[in-house]
Amino acid sequence: MKSGRFIGVMSGTSLDGVDVVLATIDEHRVAQLASLSWPIPVSLKQAVLDICQGQQLTLSQFGQLDTQLGRLFADAVNALLKEQNLQARDIVAIGCHGQTVWHEPTGVAPHTLQIGDNNQIAARTGITVVGDFRRRDIALGGQGAPLVPAFHHALLAHPTERRMVLNIGGIANLSLLIPGQPVGGYDTGPGNMLMDAWIWRQAGKPYDKDAEWARAGKVILPLLQNMLSDPYFSQPAPKSTGREYFNYGWLERHLRHFPGVDPRDVQATLAELTAVTISEQVLLSGGCERLMVCGGGSRNPLLMARLAALLPGTEVTTTDAVGISGDDMEALAFAWLAWRTLAGLPGNLPSVTGASQETVLGAIFPANP
């Protein structure tokens, strides 16, 4: 069974940077050693946003973007290696999620698409890459997402305490770690995505630091109720979503009914939308004693305060409190999934994704000989 140093690479729906994490992994433990966040050039970020909102592009443009993202991921890995004074031979493999540009797990031809050419990463780092993690699960009738609950269960499950792990990235997803029950998990809806999109358009800021804008505004209750009427929120699990659905166009359609509103009030309402949709799903799933939050949203003081208020009797904390950096959780998960792939172990949970069976995930791109 492969063990040793692995690197995880994650570029999420929030597009706030490439997260790269170094860890030692074996069948008994996952120990994080180092991490860094690598910036995404504005031009690449905008190109990804355009695709996710349905903008057409030529096959040549698409291929170039795939290559450029692969090179970007390789640069991020090489920067971490240099920082840690490591060589390619010191790393067993890289687990790279890729950049999701479309996720449509239902319909006549279910599919999901993550780009960032793994061949570029393997060639430019000299390290074996495991990627394309989601499509085997979809081929077996699953949603292809979320995949991180398996990792949450391996690291954070408790024999007696009802726990849930909440990742608030661009999309928010929940892992249900309930003793005596199969692991559950699904996407609850928007996490930071709509908040980030709104403040970017209104103030040119990548995100609402310390929720300053949202705290200066007031929740517009009719707008909140209008958004909560979206059928995704009442759809039963298994379910997953992404930027192709909850994007700026989605927000604009709801705002048409509310002309002339204060932008800060919209920001406050979007924060409340995230908090309410998460808390409702926690309660519908039977509640928990401890909700451990990770992802960029765990740094949003308003979101954390609202979750605590909406979930009385639940200890709302961050995964940092149990020794796992909330900023690095997803990248760490894909390093772990790469380890499982090389070990020939399944990486999905049918109780989460709805797949017909467990399966080894991903494709392997060997290092240069």
Curated annotation (Swiss-Prot):
Matches recorded under InterPro entries: Anhydro_N_Ac-Mur_kinase, ATPase_NBD
Keyword Cytoplasm in record: no
EC id: 2.7.1.170
Binding residue positions for ATP: G12, T13, S14, L15, D16, G17, V18, D19
Annotated keywords: ATP-binding, Carbohydrate metabolism, Kinase, Nucleotide-binding, Transferase
Gene designation per UniProt: anmK
Catalytic activity, reaction form: 1,6-anhydro-N-acetyl-beta-muramate + ATP + H2O = N-acetyl-D-muramate 6-phosphate + ADP + H(+)
Pathway entry: Amino-sugar metabolism; 1,6-anhydro-N-acetylmuramate degradation; Cell wall biogenesis; peptidoglycan recycling
Family, per entry: Belongs to the anhydro-N-acetylmuramic acid kinase family.
Role played: Catalyzes the specific phosphorylation of 1,6-anhydro-N-acetylmuramic acid (anhMurNAc) with the simultaneous cleavage of the 1,6-anhydro ring, generating MurNAc-6-P. Is required for the utilization of anhMurNAc either imported from the medium or derived from its own cell wall murein, and thus plays a role in cell wall recycling.
Domain of life: Bacteria
PANTHER family: ANHYDRO-N-ACETYLMURAMIC ACID KINASE
GO molecular function, one term: ATP binding
A Pfam family that the UniProt record links to this protein: AnmK
GO annotation, biological process: 1,6-anhydro-N-acetyl-beta-muramic acid catabolic process; amino sugar metabolic process; peptidoglycan turnover
Enzyme class: transferase
Annotated organism of origin: Escherichia coli O7:K1 (strain IAI39 / ExPEC)
The protein's name: Anhydro-N-acetylmuramic acid kinase
